[in-house]
Amino acid sequence: MSKKIFISAIEYSANIHALKLIQSLRNLNLNFEIYGIFDEQIINQKSQFSPNDFRVMGFSGIVKLIPKYFDIKNKLAHLAMQCDIAIFIDSSSFNIPIIKKIQNTKIIYYILPQVWAWKGYRAKLLSTLCDELWGIIPFEKDYYPKDSNICYVGHPLLDEIPYSNTKKQNTNKIALMPGSRKSEIKNLFPIFKEVSQKIPDKKFILIAPKNFQNKNLKHIYGEIENIEISFEPYNTLKECEFAFVCSGTATLETTLLGIPTILAYKTRMLDFLIAKSLVKLKFIGLANIFLSYKYHKNINKKKLQAPIHPEFLQFFNAQSLIDAYHNFDYERFFKEKESLINYLEYGSAKICANKLQNFYKNK
């Protein structure tokens, strides 16, 4: 008999993780049907609700979506209760209110909220609401109640990224990754573009999200006629010797690929001030955060020798990034990259699929 699996995947990355999980389930020859809210183009299956209207950035941006969210929250909960398993991936602000309304369905949270960074109360809340918590960071369990049903399932990027053990050769190509949200791009891409203009001996490649392929890129990025465009992040990054990126997750991706990286993040001032008051972290790049914990058992350790990659937040200009590029510590980067891969150990898709298979057998 076919099992019904509900999936809630709002963000682009969450849909990629969901796809890998679904592929691993199919490799086990399990009979199942997928329902929920996810990207039809990525999952290659019809969804009952589209996540496109709910992808926002920042504290103030989400306010505009509240009326629409309340309209479908009950519908999503009702759909989940018609399924055998409900899997919620990332996006805790979106998912937790839905989970609270679900009864008599096994609830799994995959890609847990970063309670180690802010809103620590969510750890106890999710432990109460969910049947299983699937963590993708080795130290996450230390921030949850001891009686929580939480386990480390591996990191999904080790499934998705052809990480490299060899040092990059000089290719004269540099990747620009200013984010996937339009507000990110608006704030950051003009600075990245200026960087590209001031390093004329390198070829710069703008890596755009795949779902931008049919959109007006000039409307999103502005004038980009002198910059090559790519919609294939991993294939493109493998050809690059350096990257400028905007997100903490992207730094983990580039590090696993062996691409020396600089992180730069700029948002609306209101959002920045709110985040600064709530988030108590020394770093925002995941590679830096993970290594901080690996070496010091403390994600806020001030005595970390040096970050594996430089980080620039809010108050910087193109010249700041250029100076960091010219002074980058390549030797330390490649040494710490190996430490990071060893720390994460393995990917998560197969482990999660096996857990679901065991649930099928025991039901």
Residue positions per predicted region:
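Phosphate-coordination loops involved in phosphoryl transfer and adenosine-cofactor binding
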Residues: 2, 171
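Active-site and donor-binding regions of nucleotide-sugar-utilizing enzymes
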Residues: 3-166, 177-189, 198-201, 209-211, ...
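Short acidic-hydrophobic, aromatic-tinged amphipathic segments that line or gate anion-handling sites
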Residues: 151, 228-232, 311-314
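Nucleotide-activated donor-binding/catalytic signature segment of Leloir-type glycosyltransferases, i.e.
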Residues: 217-232
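A donor-sugar binding/catalytic signature common to diverse glycosyltransferases
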Residues: 231-281
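Leloir-type glycosyltransferase catalytic cores
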Residues: 282-349
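C-terminal alpha-helical cap of glycosyltransferases
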Residues: 346-363
